[in-house]
Amino acid sequence: MKIPQPFLPLRAESQNYEHTIHVIGRDYTVGADGMLRSIRSQGVELLAAPVRIVAVEDGEPSHWDENYPENEAESFIQRRSDEEIIVCGAKQSERFIVDSCTRIGYDGGVDIDLKLMPRGRTVAQVFGVADAKPMRFRLDRLWLEIPLRAEAATLFHMFPNSVLSLADGTERPMGTMSASGAVPAQDAAMPFKALLWLGNEERGLGWYAESDRSWQPEDPEKAIELVRDGEQLILRLRLLDSQPETWTADPADGVYAYHPVTFCFGVQATPVKPFPQQPYIHNAFHIDCGAKVKGNYIDVLAGRYDELKEKGVTTLILHEKWNKCQNWFELSEFTAHQLHTIVDECHKRGIKVLPYFGYELSTMAPQWSEWQDKVKMVDEKGAMEGGWWRVPFQRDYVVCYHSEYEALFLNGMEKLMDEFHIDGVYLDSITFPRLCYSTEHGCGWYDPQGRLHGSYCLKTLRRMFRRLYEIVQSRGGEINVHSFGYLNFLTIPYIHQNWYGENLQFDRMKGDTEDLDLDYFRAEYLGRNMGAPVEFIAYENRPLWTFEQALACSVLHGILPRPNEIHHPLELMSRVWKVFGAFPIEQSEWMPYWTNNARADHEKVRISYYRYTDLSGAPQLLAFAVNISAKPVEKVTVSFPEPVVQAREMLEGRDVGLTFGLDGYSCRILFAK
């Protein structure tokens, strides 16, 4: 296959029983035992020590045979191609074997299978010409530990959201923004997670698993632990805290009675691809999202295309009502006419068009009766989920892409791009890893007691987005995705821009006056530590929460909010776009508040900026001074390490110097030189 840009064909080097696989921006080294011993992102090592298996057998710590020059069990490359390299490895203790299969994809995703089994007998022992030591195959513990450099893992994100149990007996409570933030200063534990990312503002390591099949933690609420050990932060996965439930025979007979137990998971270093030097990839206007409009879009937009152009819009995003039948690919006569008209009018003015598609099947779809049972996502009771209501009157129910709907979706996207010449697609939460229990299309699994458990189709979503990326990228298009409170780093390689922030809106729209949670913002909304640019969602509820306040919160972190109303928010962002367009962002260095030496003499003010050096060697700054609190700051003086002496407030168009006031949750956009 042809590797899509910006990715590169995989390369592998083998030396001293180790194999280093080079992925764009990252390097993974698999050791002689099949375990990852080095993970580098942007040239920086993430691991403090090799990944290890910690086991206790028959009451004693396991000791693994590490003498690979003599034991003839060193890891090897099973297969290699431009898009995937597979490395197999093995570990053996006195009683047990762990075989591993590590698959590294060109996007940097590393799928790992571990197979645990009793140690076998030699040929001589089988034929009775050598003694076979009597042995009890009892396994008391099997943990996987990933030792990270503590300085490389200061932030975290987890999905699904939950409380964190802390070492002092307290809990970090669950809330709308508790899924991300600063890694606790003390040891912490959590239930099983499908996605867990540990990193900082520049890079990190994601861990993932579609289910906890075969896991037996002593306490399910503490299946995963974050353990501090000096300069290390150890990610501990408690795979087994007791003998596997499927091993029911007497341990003395385990050599043949116990069958292999498999654990499936993976890791992915971030950023997943190079972050663009110009992260503001378009000036997007999103119609009918949050700020709802009456009538059909063809009528709402009539006579306004020139206005969009004049205000700097380069991308028009159509929300769900563009399509009479929610998310369906076969368009009605009116919908086809509407889309053709909007695309034609926009293209005349150099504006791209991205229509909405979501994650549901509508009762209005002519194929509802044919597809509903085949593609529905079901809960543990077998019931469909969802039921979104919209006009024309219909209900929309959640689909599972680990079904025939994957192919249906991809074929539909390809045909729409070719027939209507759309410039990509806006996808609402399609990357969300939903817990599905439908064994009819391959989700879910039964434990030894016959209980049904759900699974997350992470690999299916990655595969689907990989193919969608090929479809859209080859036609010069863009994939724009809305995500709500989660970071699916498996799909981010195939996304051009993410739209985050809806969960934060719930609190702000109701009048929340807490200081901006900077740790949360840096963990989840930056984009730079993941590899794809971000825009910020802003739903106004004046006077409690305004678009200006959303601008302040986001611009401090190098991202911009997306306007969703043709008057005020768009008029404001039109001015912001002009400011950003006039500054040489692509030739500038991003200097965020958490690393720069800019100072403010008020504790609630933070400063980030872009620094450009002109041909004479003089610095020019596009700076953002932000009040992170709800209370006004009457007077603050800011300073920069660069020799700048004057500052102009770019939205007001006047010189303000380096001393000024700031309303609650407000910002000054300054040009300083």
Where are these regions (language model features)?
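Polysaccharide-binding surfaces and accessory modules of carbohydrate-active proteins
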Residues: 1, 6, 107, 111-226, ...
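Acidic-aromatic substrate-binding/catalytic surfaces of carbohydrate-active enzymes
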Residues: 2-9, 13-94, 101, 150-172
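Beta-strand-rich recognition/accessory modules
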Residues: 17, 22-26, 31-61, 92, ...
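Active-site-adjacent "subsite" loops/lids of carbohydrate-active enzymes
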Residues: 293, 297-298, 339, 344, ...
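Catalytic domains of carbohydrate-active enzymes, especially glycoside hydrolases
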Residues: 299-323, 419-420
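Active-site neighborhood of glycoside hydrolase catalytic domains
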Residues: 401-491, 513
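Active-site-proximal substrate-binding groove within the catalytic cores of carbohydrate-active enzymes
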Residues: 457, 462-650, 666
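C-terminal beta-strand-rich structural cap/linker in extracellular carbohydrate-active enzymes
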Residues: 658-673
